């Protein structure tokens, strides 16, 4: 078995010194191990195609090996320890949450009740609706973090909010985003930020549907479908869909328009200036998830009313903390609204890690941008590859119009090999990169994204133009010759 890596500060793990640069977690013996080697890792190794399928089909052999998982999809062992400590009656289950608001919402959905136990808010509900509670946990992202669970288990209390550090982090985000710190809020996860945005626009126009423009990350669409009164899904996010949206807005009052810039996993770039101008003419706010584009690369604030970002990804870069942010455009349609979601905030111990990790975000992003663009061109020229999805390969894209000076095209790309049904699993298992979910880390990650995000709806994903045999790469800051050699071997 591989030996645990020694604990080191984030600053010591930057550059080529990170253990995952030298020894990625991709061997069969790594199944279920955290990526990175941290009690609070947000990714987990699924090293073979069969492991991915087994995980999705809840194969007991695979699940027994899982030491951790992505915190919204997988209840962290520390969370389960908290659940075991919270008093529950026979026939009752419990989930701890980051705030009273989240606990009460979950309780309302499950016919249960919210209680505060030793400073910790939790929802109690009948065992038969545990799946409903887990869906709330997953989709809304208003989860209790593993660090909060650890503190409560060891000391019997949670740390108080660190207002000074919260201000430091929001001012840092303000410098990158162009919005004032007073219009930025921190959240327990990226999805929690999106859910707060959803609540804000839904409250503003109650009883109205939302629009999903372009094919999004799975849980964004689930929020609009399950928590709202309906959603108009325009999966292509192209000019034809823009025309459809124009006709829709002429006949129906819409609460909000959600999109990604670029999208996950096809890296599609919506014409955000046109989309925002159309929406503004009808008084409809536009909510943009810029997690893949990042504040470093693109300036989208003039064309968005709200920007939701998963800080878990590139801004942290280490993959050991969950966090999100929501930015309000001070000149947008929601400028006079209260900052959404300020009731939950980010747990103090997580905030400390995020602040430390994010200090070198621009430096990391520049290197990852350069590596990703080289890799995209390498793959586009390779005879085994059918298609590469990356904004930098399309010189006509609106992405360049919104690109910041010194900004790149991002660190995420997807590609489809020829004869993907047979070749993709082999390439995945030959690629000497850490094999796990998530993105934005300064060590590269590869995953069969569609299999993991849409395994039980593959035909539907295919109908939206998403091939089930795509591989998504989150490109890290390894030396380019190292990455090139690894891809050359995998594709040979």
List each language-model region with its residue ranges:
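Conserved PLP cofactor-binding pocket of PLP-dependent enzymes
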Residues: 429-458
